[in-house]
């Protein structure tokens, strides 16, 4: 895969020890579970989990919703998963963010799967972009989506599961469209693409 810009801020990145194999076995791990782990292992676990799971390459999406009072809101997310084909369910994993405050009101969200040439869109909706023009939206089934995306998936929120410091928003798919093209990918804290 080819490498492009690395993100800063709160996005997954490479650790100083990236490239060296790192042990995934916690010191002093016993059948007693997490309580037996050392304080150091526990305090470094979030960073190391980001680094480890950052090696799981993903696509990049923009989640959108529309609120009567506030209009369209969008955010970049790669914590997106196909959960079930019948019934058709997907999930989006959200941390503390504005989207998570708006979704209980709208009860619906759209997933735009970004194409290789939409890195600037991903940066913008992650709050890290420098767009000079406001992004346009296209509407389908009453939900806004990003034009130029490879797929549009519209969902009604069917279930909500708090999970640690995130919440899993399970959506029942109401409509979907897709086209062929190269995807935008995210790997080890960087946007990239197919080789
Ligand atoms: C590759 C990647 C994957 C990520 N995956 C996840 C994930 O799975 N889960 C997670 O919780 N976080 C994820 N994030 C982080 C997340 O994108 C940011 O924390 C984001 O800022 C959260 O958005 P928000 O809802 O809090 O809204 P804001 O931070 O308020 O909005 C995000 C940005 O979108 C712009 N924006 C929103 N609506 C509009 C509009 N209608 N018109 C124009 N601009 C608009 C805002 O101006 C802002 O710049 C990811 C970030 C990256 C880079």
Model-derived regions, located:
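Basic, polyanion-binding surface patches
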Residues: 2-195
């Amino acid at each position: 895969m080819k490498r492009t810009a690395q993100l800063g801020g709160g996005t997954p990145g490479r650790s100083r020890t990236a490239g060296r194999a790192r042990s995934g076995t916690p010191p002093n791990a016993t059948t007693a579970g997490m309580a037996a782990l050392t304080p150091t292992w526990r305090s470094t676990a979030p960073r190391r989990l980001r680094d480890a799971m950052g090696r799981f390459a993903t696509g990049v999406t923009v989640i959108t919703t529309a609120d009567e009072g506030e209009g369209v809101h969008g955010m970049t997310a790669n914590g997106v998963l196909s959960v079930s084909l019948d019934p058709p369910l997907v999930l989006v994993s959200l941390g503390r963010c504005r989207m998570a405050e708006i979704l209980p009101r709208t009860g619906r969200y759209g997933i735009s799967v970004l194409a290789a040439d939409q890195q600037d869109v991903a940066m913008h909706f992650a709050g890290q972009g420098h767009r000079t023009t406001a992004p346009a939206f296209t509407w389908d089934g009453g939900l806004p989506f990003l034009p130029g995306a490879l797929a549009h998936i519209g969902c009604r929120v069917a279930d909500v599961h708090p999970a640690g410091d995130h919440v899993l928003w399970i959506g029942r798919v109401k409509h979907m469209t897709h086209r062929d093209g190269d995807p935008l990918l995210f790997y080890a804290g960087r946007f990239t693409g197919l080789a």
